[in-house]
C-alpha cells in the first residue's frame, strides 16, 4: 500500500508539471523559448535570450 501511495504521488506531480509548460515566440517569430511553470521565470527570459522584450 505504501508503494502505491508513492507511485500515485509521483504521478500527480508529473501530471501537474506537464500542464504548466509552454512555448513563447517574439513578434517577429525569429526567436522563441520554452518555460516550465511560468514565462516570467524562464531562464531564457531572465538572461535576455531573445533580446529586449519590446521587440
From Swiss-Prot:
It is a single-pass membrane protein. Disulfide bonds: none annotated. The chain crosses the membrane at residues 7-24. It comes from the Bacteria. InterPro entries: DUF4223. The keyword Cytoplasm does not apply. Pfam families: DUF4223. GO terms for cellular component: membrane. Keywords: Membrane, Transmembrane, Transmembrane helix. It is found in: Membrane. This is Uncharacterized protein YhfL.
Amino acid at each position: 500500500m505504501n508503494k502505491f501511495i508513492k507511485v500515485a504521488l509521483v504521478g500527480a506531480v508529473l501530471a501537474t508539471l506537464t500542464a504548466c509548460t509552454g512555448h513563447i515566440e517574439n513578434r517577429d517569430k525569429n526567436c522563441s523559448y520554452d518555460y516550465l511553470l511560468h514565462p516570467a521565470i524562464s531562464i531564457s527570459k531572465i538572461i535576455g535570450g531573445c533580446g529586449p522584450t519590446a521587440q
